[in-house]
Amino acid sequence: MEVARAVADRASIAYILQKRPLGLGHAVWCACELVCYEPFALLLPDVLVQCKGKGCLAQMLDVYEAHGGNIIAVEPVPDAQLHSYGVVGIGEGNGSVFPINGMVEKPKPGTAPSNLTILGRYILQPEIFDILSAKETGTGGEIQITDAMIRLLATQDFHAVKYEGRTFDCGSKLGFLLANV
């Protein structure tokens, strides 16, 4: 409870209601006016990130300060599970930071550009809203944030951060249980 009070004293929290489930890209687009066309961090709440040392977003902010552009936290996943995630293709990097040269949402088996998956932590530039405003649907008939990022990649730099830590996908029963053990 002390943590909640400390955060409440220093933060302003707002929410936007997505009236229809049209995809993550649509949910982000719904927040456009709240973000006021500024760079922003997007943290998906169904992914719990347990880091060693510095938090995941803090690691990402360090990369943002050094490189600017768009930053995505990634983690390696076994090849058999890649079809369930957004996957990035990367160039030469320096340990835990890599330039992104491609992305694909839920690739078919054997077509993923790497084993690095997007884990639900992003720092994005506001031009993403221009792309999302077209409301083009992608995988599953939804407005996908990954599809919008692929288009933005044509004009802006993206970097992947292989954060130090572990994630729990609380959107699955097993992930939720593991997060609570």
What role is predicted for each listed range?
Residues M1-L44, L48-K52:
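Conserved N-terminal catalytic core of the sugar/cofactor nucleotidyltransferase
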Residues R10-S12, H67, T155-D157:
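A generic structural signal for alpha->beta connector loops
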Residues L17, L42-L44, A73-P76, K162-Y163:
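Short beta-strand segments
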Residues R20-L24, D79-A80, P109-T111, T167-D169:
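A short acidic, often aromatic-flanked loop/helix-cap motif at beta-alpha or helix-coil junctions
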Residues H26, G55, Q144:
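Short, conserved clusters of charged catalytic residues that mark active-site
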Residues L34, V63-Y64, L152:
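Hydrophobic helix-cap positions at the C-terminus of alpha-helices
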Residues Y37-P39, I90, S96-N101, P113-V181:
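Conserved alpha/beta core of the MobA/IspD/sugar-nucleotide pyrophosphorylase nucleotidyltransferase superfamily
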Residues L48-D130, K135:
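Conserved core of the sugar-phosphate nucleotidyltransferase
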